[in-house]
Amino acid sequence: HGGGQNRLGLGSKAEVLGIINPDVVASPNLIANLVSELLEDDVAIAEAAQVPMEHPKDYDRNTLETTFASGCCMFIKQEIFEQINGFDDINFFMYCDDVDLSWRVRLLGKKIHFVPLATVYHDHRIDESSNLVVGHAEFYYSALGGLLLSIKWGNQKRTEQIVNSLKTDPSYSEVYSEYSAMVENGKLPQATVGSDKVAIFTPTGFADYRWTN
């Protein structure tokens, strides 16, 4: 995911880059609403709202500021994308790479805005109990990405909790095997300087939630 975005975005002559999942349908005013938010000098990323299943992370209702942008649909200033060298496609294949990118943007002192009027339909499957259906790739890479994010952003307690969970839960055996191989081969991410200034870890994820299931 991140590697493909980097190949297209790094070195681009565009002023704004659109990071958009292939399983979304844009609303008519999506581009105008996101680009207009980026007219503010200190705003580096503008994030779209997802429907019908909105992302639950919180945002400031007055300023629209939020702590990270979902890679489902966000616009980022190309100069900022260039400055942080895009997505970290060395440590993240997909999932949590958007959080990592967002936090590195915030380390620059830039802001991320959630734009409720900029909407995309994000295709999801739910089961008969209205629970989100998660495929193997999402299950695997989201678990691995969450672990690598906690390592890269210096949350040792969270890292230990995740590793213990992966080790004892048979459903995560593939993820634990990959982690063990990374440890053996010295492939774990290096800790980020200044992580305490921007990184947020909560029981539900990487931001405060407006609601929980």
Show the residue positions of the predicted features.
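Glycine-rich, basic loop-to-helix element that forms the pyrophosphate-binding segment
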Residues: 1-12
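Conserved donor NDP-sugar-binding/catalytic core segment of glycosyltransferases
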Residues: 24-60
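Short aromatic/hydrophobic "clamp" motif used to bind/position activated sugar donors
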Residues: 17
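A short, conserved alpha-helix in the catalytic core of glycosyltransferases
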Residues: 34, 74-76, 80-85, 90-119, ...
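Non-catalytic, C-terminal membrane-associated alpha-helical segments of glycosyltransferases
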Residues: 140-141, 155-213
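A recurrent flexible, glycine/aromatic-enriched loop bordering the glycosyltransferase active site
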Residues: 57-76, 99-100, 130
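Active-site donor/metal-binding and catalytic loop motifs
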Residues: 115-134, 145-148
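Acidic donor-diphosphate engagement hotspot in glycosyltransferases and nucleotidyltransferases
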Residues: 5, 29-31, 97
